[in-house]
């Protein structure tokens, strides 16, 4: 039986929540590979919203570094089986 690293096979549920005047996505929950960088989530949101101006926050608290891996963010800040990512078109929190 071949073993793979847990980061390569684990999928993380990312719950995208609109904040402020940002448009609400038709589908708010997506599965993302744990090995992906958070920058992939940001790029995906930019494509969905057709906007270059985007501010993202984890748990309405902080804006993570785009180089962070999704699995690390989930392990440290995820709850109820998902990573909550708030997004806005203008700065929502300092």
UniProtKB/Swiss-Prot annotation:
Superkingdom classification of source: Eukaryota
A cellular component annotation (GO) from this entry: cytoplasm
Record's subcellular location: Cytoplasm
Signal peptide start-end: none
Tissue-specificity statement: Ubiquitous.
Coiled-coil regions, chain positions: none
Pfam families: APG12
UniProt GO BP: autophagosome assembly; autophagy; protein transport
Keyword terms, alphabetized: Acetylation, Autophagy, Cytoplasm, Isopeptide bond, Protein transport, Transport, Ubl conjugation pathway
Cysteines paired by S-S bonds: none
Residues carrying N-acetylalanine: 2
Location in chain, cross-link Glycyl lysine isopeptide (Gly-Lys) (interchain with K-128 in ATG5): 94
InterPro entries: Atg12, Ubiquitin-like_domsf
SUPFAM superfamilies, sorted: Ubiquitin-like
UniProt keyword Cytoplasm present: yes
Its biological purpose: Ubiquitin-like protein involved in cytoplasm to vacuole transport (Cvt) and autophagy vesicles formation. Conjugation with ATG5 through a ubiquitin-like conjugating system involving also ATG7 as an E1-like activating enzyme and ATG10 as an E2-like conjugating enzyme, is essential for its function. ATG12/ATG5 conjugate has an essential role in plant nutrient recycling.
Family, as annotated: Belongs to the ATG12 family.
Name of the protein described by the UniProt record: Ubiquitin-like protein ATG12B
């Amino acid at each position: 039986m071949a073993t793979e690293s847990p980061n390569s096979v684990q999928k993380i549920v990312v719950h995208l929540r609109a904040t402020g005047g940002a448009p609400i996505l038709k589908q708010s929950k997506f599965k993302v590979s744990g090995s992906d960088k958070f920058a992939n989530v940001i790029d995906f949101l930019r494509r969905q919203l057709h906007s270059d101006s985007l501010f993202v926050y984890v748990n309405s608290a902080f804006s993570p570094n785009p180089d962070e891996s999704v699995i690390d963010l989930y392990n440290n800040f995820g709850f109820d089986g998902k990573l909550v990512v708030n997004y806005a078109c203008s700065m929502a929190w300092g």
